[in-house]
Amino acid sequence: MNNILSNINIIEYNGKYNKKINDFVNLSMHIFIGRPFKQREDLINIQDYYIEKGGNFWIAFDEDKIVGTIALENRNTIGILKRFYVDKDYQRLGIGSLLYNEFETYVKAKTNIKTIYLACGKSLKDAHNFYTKNGWKQINKLDIDMHFANDD
């Protein structure tokens, strides 16, 4: 792949980097889906929202810069893939795949999740292609634009 991948370090959330995570997610949401900057409920306390409920939150770093995130919200046998963003300058380098592999490995090894859902805006064609390539199937519209399911 690219040499950049050798510099990428993916860690599980450890109580650090809260401001950096919030800033990165807000900027990503603004760039990719036009959402305004604000404090996101799940990012106020990642430990309680994700970790304590059997989910997880991963951060990809290039040195000290956050370049990607992905999160798992665990609802017993149902999981929700959330906060999956890669910095626009780092896309198509394999970082999304690295994050997704961490997510998938964790789900299979450490949870009882049978089905995973995610929401994806209609305009995010690259994201749709990524999910389809990774075995996700589009399902009917629920509360927001697009939902995909992966029940492997």
Predicted regions and their residues:
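Conserved long hydrophobic alpha-helices within structured protein cores
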Residues: 34-37, 95-99, 127-138
